[in-house]
């Protein structure tokens, strides 16, 4: 989402206090803030987005990606370890456009990169979304430029670097 300049920290704090929002971060990239919304139902997610997030006056635009959750390549145990490791200082979300019908091939390739803590095929403007974590920025940079962007079937990608100062 994009917001009024200077309101990022306030909005992130507000978003993190909303039931159903599991994390929000400021980013460097095309968008100012990225949030993860979780609910047992699709209607629950829609309500959080349309009735809560989009009603915040300082938020100027939103873009929603919906996870497909069709394949379980990132196992729960790995996610638990990722959560424990999740205090890595360098983090980013990477959104990816793939060649037509190659989303799951890309997802399978991503599952072999240890620094990718979460990834899924998404519905929306992009095809795949992944969260990358590393202990330092240079490692994160190498994973994105030499690991992710070099994979076959990727047409374009956009990186949203998480800004920890706004958390």
Locations of regions flagged by a protein language model:
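A compositional/biophysical signature of low hydrophobicity enriched in polar/charged and small residues
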Residues: 1-167
